[in-house]
Swiss-Prot record:
Gene3D superfamilies: 2.70.40.10. This is Deoxyuridine 5'-triphosphate nucleotidohydrolase. The lineage of its organism: Bacteria, Pseudomonadati, Pseudomonadota, Betaproteobacteria, Burkholderiales. The keyword Protease does not apply. It catalyses: dUTP + H2O = dUMP + diphosphate + H(+). This enzyme is involved in nucleotide metabolism: it produces dUMP, the immediate precursor of thymidine nucleotides and it decreases the intracellular concentration of dUTP so that uracil cannot be incorporated into DNA. Pathway: Pyrimidine metabolism; dUMP biosynthesis; dUMP from dCTP (dUTP route): step 2/2. One of its GO terms (biological process) is dUMP biosynthetic process. Keywords: Hydrolase, Magnesium, Metal-binding, Nucleotide metabolism. Belongs to the dUTPase family. It comes from Burkholderia thailandensis (strain ATCC 700388 / DSM 13276 / CCUG 48851 / CIP 106301 / E264). It comes from the Bacteria. Pfam families: dUTPase. GO terms for molecular function: dUTP diphosphatase activity; magnesium ion binding. It is an enzyme of class 3 (hydrolase).
Length: 148
């Protein structure tokens, strides 16, 4: 799949999104910063990537997801948990960054901060019904299938 990518900050030509390995699902996104940013515990920051994409096809969307190592080792996750990029969005990709850890974290310019995953999308329509056909689960919700 070929994506249209717009470079909004010329410095990002040297840091284009790429897969770290042949089996990677996510393309690494980097922080397009002029200087380091210090995130104290509980702080949030909206970090630019210097890039924009246009998927164009409504059968696809992109997800911005955290990098597992940053979350596990440093408590750096996404403030919005998952960033959803719609197929018709053409603006800059921004990374909502949250330090949920216990110590300060310094985010350096061009550091890998998140990952971009392209996913298929089905746009549903609704069929209004009075009742559903019976299922084994029914309306059983949280914890209804047991613990083990």
């Amino acid at each position: 799949m070929k994506l249209d990518l717009k470079i909004l900050d010329a410095r990002m030509r040297d840091y284009l999104p790429k897969y770290a390995t042949t089996g990677s699902a996510g393309l690494d996104l980097r922080a397009c910063l002029d200087a380091p940013v210090t995130l104290k515990p509980g702080d949030t920051a909206l970090v630019p990537t210097g890039l924009a994409i246009h998927l164009a096809d409504p059968g696809y969307a992109a997800l911005i997801l955290p990098r597992s190592g940053l979350g596990h080792k440093h408590g750096i996750v996404l403030g919005n948990l998952v960033g959803l990029i719609d197929s018709d969005y053409q603006g800059e990709l921004m990374i909502s960054t949250w330090n949920r850890g216990q110590t300060e974290f310094v985010l350096n310019p061009f550091e890998r901060l998140a990952q971009l995953v392209i996913v298929p999308v089905v746009q549903a329509t609704f069929n209004i019904v009075g009742d559903f056909a019976q299922s084994d689960r029914g309306a059983g919700g949280f914890g209804s299938t047991g613990r083990h």
